[in-house]
């Protein structure tokens, strides 16, 4: 699928989901990058790698959180914030409140987002540990990002990660 889509199409959707760009969060953040045909090391095999989040693709944890929230919101991407409101500790009065700001909307193709969300709700049952029996329905996706650095043996370092949102319903 990655070869047929090519990184051009894949990157366009990844960008709309919040990857490869600033999220708008209130603190400094890294932009990351998406694999592009203009990359110096580009070959068509990078299209396949980019489709699974590898190749020259680099994303930040806050971009992944934005991505998960966009899936949860049926393709509507909101500006990401760490703070919903600032309250006066003495009175409880709201001093400042963050208003939702739509950054992009991905027009779904039929029930695409529903299928993705449904798949994400099945993942916890495949994971051992407390997440599989958590009392609130969780939607998640696991991954194993590969780093460019290698061990002396030549094997790549791997990082375990997971994006999630709850409640899943």
At which residue positions do the language-model features occur?
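Beta-lactam-recognizing serine transpeptidase/beta-lactamase-like catalytic domain environment
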Residues: 1-169
């Amino acid at each position: 699928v990655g070869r047929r889509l090519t990184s051009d199409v894949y990157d366009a959707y990844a960008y709309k989901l919040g990857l490869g760009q600033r999220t708008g969060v209130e603190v400094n953040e890294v932009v990351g990058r998406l694999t592009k045909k203009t990359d110096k090391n580009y070959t068509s095999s990078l299209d396949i790698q980019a489709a699974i989040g590898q190749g020259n693709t680099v994303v930040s944890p806050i971009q992944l959180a934005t991505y998960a929230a966009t899936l949860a919101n049926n393709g509507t991407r909101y500006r990401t914030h760490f703070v919903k409101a600032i309250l006066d500790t003495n009175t409880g009065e709201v001093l400042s409140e963050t208003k939702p700001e739509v950054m992009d909307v991905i027009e779904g193709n039929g029930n695409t987002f529903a299928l993705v969300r449904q798949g994400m709700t099945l993942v916890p049952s495949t994971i051992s540990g407390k997440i599989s029996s958590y009392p609130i329905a969780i939607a998640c996706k696991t991954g194993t990002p590969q780093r460019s650095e290698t061990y002396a043996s030549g094997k790549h370092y791997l990082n375990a990660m997971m994006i999630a949102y709850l409640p899943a319903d």
